[in-house]
Amino acid sequence: MKVGFIGLGRMGSAMAANLLRAGHELAVWNRSPDKADPLVQRGARHATSPRDAAEADVVMTMLADDSAVEAAVYGEGGILGGSALHVSHSTISVALADRLAADHQERSGFVSAPVFGRPVAAETAKLFVVAAGLAGHIDLCEPLFMAMGQRVFRVGTRPSAANLVKLSGNFMIMSAVEAMAEAMTLAEKGGVGRATLLEVLTGTLFGAPVYQTYGDILVEDRFRPAGFAAPLGLKDMNLVDAAATASRVPMPVLGVVRDHLRAVIAQEGEDIDWAGVGLAIRRGAGTG
């Protein structure tokens, strides 16, 4: 299939590489052009603009936030004028996803397909893809999704449903990290090591991947290089808050999580992993 890919950060580069590996014809674009070089060396075409990348069957965007997606779609040389079905893998607001769906409706079509998984999952094609949009559009994209991931979840025909699932999932991940970090701080202050607590928890009732993956990160203080940077986590929690406000859903845990993300960014800088909230929690308890 002829595919355009826009957004070549660590996640996007890995996803695009897997599309190449699966034999798809790929054009790539990134705001910093040098990010495209490794993929071009492997056979991708370096598109001259987002719209150039969108001269394809499908154009995928994997960008940091709403403003980056808006620039790629609506800016000069944006993809809205292209012929490709637009698939957004970005974690964006529900409101922007609704706007994109409306604006693409009379053109090529739009699918929201955010992913769950850290960079190593992207590199090994083990992502989980959450897709929403017209069934025929998702059918077209499913071979592409399976080149990058291990499972596709279809969550409805309204594209923003996938973004709501992704934001809800990210809130649950961050809440699990918050709870583990608080529990580890309590245990450690009472003389029980973090590793010991984690072994008990994951060996009994908390064996899910989120506890195993982030528990190890918290035990080892493995916060750099960031698999998912704290400012992006804070951005996502702000999007959760916007969705909760729009739906009048109280989410008190969200406020705690956001405060700890703000604290660790202020204390450690923007290159810290979002699991670095554990540092802010320890400092609050006088152990950091």
Please name every model-derived segment.
Residues M1-M62, S90, P119, R151:
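NAD(P)+-binding Rossmann beta1-loop-alpha1 motif at the extreme N-terminus of oxidoreductases
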Residues M15-A16, K35, L100, L144, ...:
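Hydrophobic residues within alpha-helices
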Residues G23, G43, R107-S108, G191, ...:
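Glycine-centered short loops/turns at secondary-structure junctions
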Residues L26, H46, F110-V111, V152, ...:
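Hydrophobic beta-strand scaffold residues
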Residues P50-S108:
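Rossmann-fold NAD(P) dinucleotide-binding segment
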Residues T91-N170:
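Rossmann-fold dinucleotide-binding core
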Residues A161-A285:
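Helical "substrate-binding/catalytic lid" subdomain
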